[in-house]
């Protein structure tokens, strides 16, 4: 097939079945021509599909998205960038699209890549548009990872659907004890708060939290921790409570 002739036909002809002709072009490896057919017909999403699936040029797809500036095009670009592990670029594209629909995959890949801090902006967009426990839960965790504790306090004071206890445990396991303290306090989980305060060397606070928890195993933990730290007066208080 003479590609120059095909291009000329596309420019001159009209009234043909766009999808059928574009498919024939793709089947024959004429990807640029298929892109041209879809673009001329204003089938922008199909044109974008050709760029990312057949021509395989994310840079050209980015240029195409910038040129058209349409939500559905930004969204398609975001998915292609995510598939190519361009995580930050993908999140930026989804934000431009105001499209939170692929949040599960975005969260999974961003967290695996250690991009929690950059994920915050995407999650802020997603929270405005949808009410999902996973989004709020990840948002709280990302704020903790970014050490944005004042923002976390503000988030916890507002209505949210986060699994706060899960985030608290995750932060505790990561050694983010100040974040854990805020999280456990916000849900009045005094048993876990007591343990966290021991790690923060706040022994009087830990004893008070243990008292509120009223749990024998928590008191035993307080007793051992206070002895280990040389806090004998507090260890005696904990021991008497066991």
Where are these regions (language model features)?
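Extended alpha-helical assembly domains of large eukaryotic scaffold proteins
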Residues: 1-242
């Amino acid at each position: 097939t003479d590609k120059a002739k095909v291009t000329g036909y596309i420019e001159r002809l009209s009234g043909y079945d766009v999808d059928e002709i574009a498919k024939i072009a793709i089947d024959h490896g004429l990807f640029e021509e298929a892109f041209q057919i879809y673009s001329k017909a204003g089938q922008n999403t199909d044109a974008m599909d050709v760029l990312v699936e057949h021509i395989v040029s994310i840079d050209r797809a980015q240029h195409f998205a910038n040129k058209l500036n349409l939500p559905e095009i930004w969204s398609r670009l975001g998915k292609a960038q995510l598939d190519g592990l361009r995580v930050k670029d993908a999140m930026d594209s989804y934000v431009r699209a105001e499209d939170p629909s692929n949040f599960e995959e975005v969260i999974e890949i961003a967290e695996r890549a250690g991009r929690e801090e950059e994920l915050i902006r995407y999650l802020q967009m997603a929270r405005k548009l949808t009410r999902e426990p996973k989004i709020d839960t990840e948002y709280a965790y990302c704020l903790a990872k970014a050490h944005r504790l004042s923002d976390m306090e503000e988030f916890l004071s507002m209505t949210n659907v986060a699994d706060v206890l899960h985030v608290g445990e995750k932060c505790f396991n990561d050694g983010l004890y100040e974040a854990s303290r805020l999280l456990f306090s916000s849900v009045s989980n005094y048993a876990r708060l007591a343990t966290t305060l021991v790690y923060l060397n706040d022994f009087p606070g830990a004893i008070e939290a243990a008292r509120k928890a009223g749990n024998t195993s928590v008191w035993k933990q307080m007793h051992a921790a206070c002895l280990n730290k040389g806090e004998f007066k507090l260890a005696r208080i904990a021991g008497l409570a066991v």
